[in-house]
């Protein structure tokens, strides 16, 4: 049986924010929770489906893989809770209800401190169109945290050890009842660590971490576009209680270019030409990302005509193909004419007999007569 689309399961759009996804999950989790629907196999199945969808879409890395490859891009078992958690495998539901009833983030029990993955970080990077097209390497500095070297991250004064929390017995969670619900929430005394620091470290004041700034080199691949994300694994916030660090996502923003407008792999630009070149044809030079290039202009060219230079666009991020450069003709009206130029134009106007130019290049028009005149 094929799985439903995770966005459809939660009833949200594909561009839904993290908050929208969490709100949708809260609502559906409360609606289908087994405690509210005893002996209902359908509600239980719905609850499992909602939970699985949330665990994928609430994780930025899994969500990205799902958006790109669908169900095949994520672990088929992702989001299906194991034993040992509150509600027989529905641990995330306990986390949501802990938020509702005032608790912090929960975790699994089992007589050990909770282990948390570090938070993901986002860095907005502005680059030029040339840098985006060719690729580049940038150095960035980001605020971060590092383990305290004085206490080795324990938060306790050197020579002492944290004590087992008396409130939760070292589990990091306490059980509470709210009406007909019985849920687990993070211990308010130790905040989920299962330990109490009675003699804190003087360097980090018991936090186990210190604020710092780190410098990273980021390789920008050729072909990146506006809003693309580059993942730097393990460069986010450090985890808690031995948990893994989060990731850093560098989001690219392309500066507006003075000449080119980008459309995916293709580039567009205006190509001004004189009205005599438009009528008679000729050759003009235009800028590209690789330098100047010559374009042969056909006779009777009208404003708005587009000349395409194949392979002069932006390289694909994956693969070796390139986009094209589309040059949009703009026929320029001459200014600051000499008396001789004005005389020639008056003569041309006279032999034109007041005919009005047409934009159909196949008809005998203004452009035809202009070409005949100059020839």
UniProtKB/Swiss-Prot annotation:
The keyword Glycoprotein does not apply. SMART domains: DnaJ. One of its GO terms (cellular component) is cytoplasm. A zinc finger (CR-type) spans 135-213. Zn(2+) 1 binds at residues 148, 151, 201, 204. Residues 5-70 form the J domain. It comes from the Bacteria. The keyword Methyltransferase does not apply. It is found in: Cytoplasm. PANTHER family: CHAPERONE PROTEIN DNAJ, DNAJ HOMOLOG 1, MITOCHONDRIAL-RELATED. Homodimer. Belongs to the DnaJ family. This is Chaperone protein DnaJ. It comes from Chromobacterium violaceum (strain ATCC 12472 / DSM 30191 / JCM 1249 / CCUG 213 / NBRC 12614 / NCIMB 9131 / NCTC 9757 / MK). The lineage of its organism: Bacteria, Pseudomonadati, Pseudomonadota, Betaproteobacteria, Neisseriales.
